[in-house]
Amino acid sequence: MMNKFCEHFVVGIIKWKLFTNWEGNMVRILFLLHDLGQGGAEKVLVNLVNNMDRSKFDITVITLFGGGVNEQFLLPHIRYQTVFKRMIPGNSKLMKLLSPQQLHRLFVKEQYDIEIAYLEGPSARVISGCCSPNTGLISWVHGEQRTRAAASRSFRSEREALDCYNRFNQVVCVSDTVKRDFESIIRLDHESIVLYNTVESEQIRELSKDDAPEVIDDGCTKLVAVGTLKEVKGFDRLLRIMKRLKDEGKMVHLYLLGQGKLAQQFEQFSVENRLDDRVTMLGYQTNPYKYVAKCDLFVCSSYSEGFSTAATEALIVGTPVVTTLVSGMKEMLGENNEYGLVTENSEEALYQGIKQLLDHPDLLDHYRKQAAIRGKMFSTENTVRAVEEMLMNLNVGLDDDSKR
């Protein structure tokens, strides 16, 4: 009997060692997302996994498509895999040909304690296909969906979207606004939670001290905007506002950081409207902070956001923020504009907000001081600890009735 016990014990130890990858009793975590491009959510994921406790978590990041600019910033201990080396045109439609379970079997080859879809849409559909009762599933929602049709765009139907999201043990939203929006559209079996984005605050402050010779002293108030050059960021209306301000004789210069499909269109608009001397397009920058820190005002012109990483970073370096009313901004800047100026989500309102700050330097100076105060609330340690506690609690809970 003792020999039989020893045999079972040794086999059990071997199985346990294989499962934990010979790295002790660590929690194996998978983060899956579309790619590691220049978007805010992608940058936030890198910040998060790089700062998680490597003695407790064995982390793998899988992207459906490779080639993203944020891949280079993953620390060496983070396992990184891509399903496809480059983006495949029409991939969302192609993936709908397969069920979530089939996609999961194709894309996820190992066993994990917790699997996280770090963006809504295709990533959530894949992770919802996990069939292991011993694996905790988390869906991370970064942006407002507004309608059930929009939330279901990457799914075969609205019914499939509802079924998939309700397979997750936990849904995490990046702001209260996103949480209210998502829960009004997707009826979850349990309440979602809010966890704020992780930013590298100390590193950002240090990098912001670097020289930025492109930012010139031309007697203009310097505006800065950062983001992918796509429709949702609203840079088209920001450029129209710049034309209007110049026509009115306002001395203002916009520095636009980012790359994307609308770059050529924006450059053409600047030339046609004689904004060459008032708009500088700097493309994608690995260190945007040095530019933001040397400008007088950060502008978020977006039609929609989750919890703006770029606006958060502006506050961290002490640059005042004016923004359209998108999700997370009231939480970030205060219900009554205590820490920055939030306008209605329209071109006219944003124009009036920028003009107000240009016409009242004392108000701009006030928000510069308030930005420095608010920027101190964004702590890398606190946001990472909150995520780690959620993961550990979920992992423990998988041993009880919370199993799917």
Question: Which residues fall in each region the model found?
Answer:
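N-terminal strand-loop element at the rim of the active site
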Residues: 31-39, 43-47, 51-94, 192
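A conserved mid-protein helix/loop that constitutes part of the nucleotide-sugar donor-binding site
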Residues: 42-47, 221-250, 261-267
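Nucleotide-sugar donor phosphate/pyrophosphate-binding loop at the beta->alpha transition
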Residues: 95-101, 136, 145-167
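Short His-centered aromatic/hydrophobic patch
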Residues: 117-123, 141
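A short, active-site helix/loop in glycosyltransferases that binds the activated sugar's phosphate group
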Residues: 125-127, 166-192, 199-203
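Aromatic "clamp/platform" in nucleotide-sugar-dependent glycosyltransferases that forms part
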Residues: 284, 303
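Short hydrophobic beta-strand element within catalytic cores of glycosyltransferases
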Residues: 320-323
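Conserved acidic donor-binding segment of nucleotide-sugar-dependent glycosyltransferases
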Residues: 335-347, 356-361
